[in-house]
């Protein structure tokens, strides 16, 4: 996969209360895949060579009628290949009643074309996703000498037509995309962060996230025995969470990450049989890093231990994931001198 990207933006303030932003972006994707099976299975989609241009234009108007209240209207137009999307508007509101507490709300139209992979493996039979999303929440932050914190809570609700969903076919040996006529997606996300610094270059930071996710199949029943309507989509956990802890001393860092995923069903009717569910699991990762600064570049090296406690788990039915494994990274960022 190769992608070329271009972007141009423009901003202008009209007084102290009105602000205009315009952005134009262009993506050119090139995808080439190879079927490396000794004998090609003609029942599966073959390797392909394809390309697509994606053009997106955005105009945003932001207005603050009062010091603690803001409103923004976004208008987006997209052209994918030779297909144009309808206008995609979004209305955003924010209110700061006191201190560093902000309430936010928005309503936005959704319209998403199938990706090149979606389109190919569905043999060009997919429809674009479309619908509306509503969300609202509150954010608060504060600070003291050498320390800072922040918390947020967000609720969202959406009805999406023609939801693009990948499902395991042929005994879970192949995944294929399809459209689900109507999906009701709603839930909540809570996050918190805290950071502290003390003498001699020491600092620490903790980030936590908890998500409650409901994605319900709301299409019309196919027949009287159809038990999939109103059920959670396969492989979508209702609960998930993550905690990341970073300890830093000068240019040395240690990161610990904990993830949790609740039970996930593998069938559309949420069958409770053994082969119809994937049990909850925890995941723990630990990494170490060191940064170096040179006149010609910034360099960072890292060592990571994935699945620290050698947990046995699956993310897909009958496909065990690796036990404890290790990784090494090297990142070089050149530092160009200006004349």
Task: Please provide the spans of the model-predicted regions.
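Face-selective signature of the C-terminal outer-membrane beta-barrel domain
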Residues: 1-85, 96, 152-155, 192-194, ...
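Residues that define the transmembrane beta-barrel architecture of outer-membrane proteins
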Residues: 2-4, 49-55, 85-87, 130-134, ...
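Residues on the lipid-exposed face of transmembrane beta-strands in outer-membrane beta-barrel proteins
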Residues: 6-12, 57-63, 91-95, 136-140, ...
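Repeated loop/turn-to-beta-strand initiation elements of outer-membrane beta-barrel proteins
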Residues: 16-20, 67-71, 99-103, 143-151, ...
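Transmembrane beta-strands of outer-membrane beta-barrel pores
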Residues: 26-32, 53-55, 75-81, 107-113, ...
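Gram-negative outer-membrane beta-barrel transporters
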Residues: 64-68, 148-149, 155-159, 179-266, ...
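Outer-membrane beta-barrel signature, preferentially recognizing the C-terminal barrel domain
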Residues: 96, 102, 106-160, 167-197, ...
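Conserved C-terminal beta-signal and adjacent last beta-strands/turns
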Residues: 105, 132, 202-210, 231-339
């Amino acid at each position: 996969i190769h992608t070329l990207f271009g972007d141009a933006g423009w901003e202008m303030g009209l007084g102290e209360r009105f602000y205009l932003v315009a952005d134009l972006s262009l993506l050119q994707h090139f995808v080439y895949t190879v079927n490396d099976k000794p004998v090609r299975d003609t029942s599966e989609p073959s390797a392909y060579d394809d390309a697509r241009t994606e053009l997106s234009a955005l105009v945003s108007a932001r207005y603050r009628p009062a010091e603690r209240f803001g409103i923004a209207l976004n208008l987006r137009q997209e052209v994918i290949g030779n297909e144009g999307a309808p206008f995609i508007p979004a209305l955003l509101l924010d209110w700061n009643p006191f201190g560093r507490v902000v309430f936010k709300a928005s309503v936005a139209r959704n319209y998403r074309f199938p990706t090149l992979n979606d389109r190919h493996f569905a043999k060009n039979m997919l429809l674009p996703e479309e619908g509306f999303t509503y969300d609202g929440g509150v954010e608060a932050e504060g600070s003291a000498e050498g320390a800072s914190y922040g918390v947020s809570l967000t609720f969202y609700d959406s009805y999406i037509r023609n939801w693009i969903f990948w499902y395991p076919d042929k005994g879970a040996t192949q995944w294929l995309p399809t459209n689900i006529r109507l999906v009701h997606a709603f839930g909540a996300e809570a996050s918190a962060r805290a950071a502290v610094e003390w003498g001699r270059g020491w600092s620490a930071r903790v980030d936590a996230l908890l998500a409650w996710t409901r994605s319900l199949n709301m299409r019309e029943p196919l027949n009287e025995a159809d038990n999939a309507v109103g059920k959670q989509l396969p492989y979508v956990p209702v609960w998930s969470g993550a905690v990341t802890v970073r300890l830093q001393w000068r240019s040395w860092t240690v990161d610990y990450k904990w993830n949790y995923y609740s039970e996930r069903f593998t069938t559309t009717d949420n069958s409770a049989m053994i082969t119809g569910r994937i049990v909850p699991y925890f995941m723990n990762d630990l990494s170490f890093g060191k940064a170096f600064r040179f006149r010609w570049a910034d360099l960072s090296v890292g060592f990571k231990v994935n699945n620290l406690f050698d947990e046995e788990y699956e993310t897909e039915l009958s496909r065990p994931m690796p036990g404890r494994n290790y990784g090494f990274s090297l990142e070089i960022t050149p530092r160009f001198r200006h004349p």
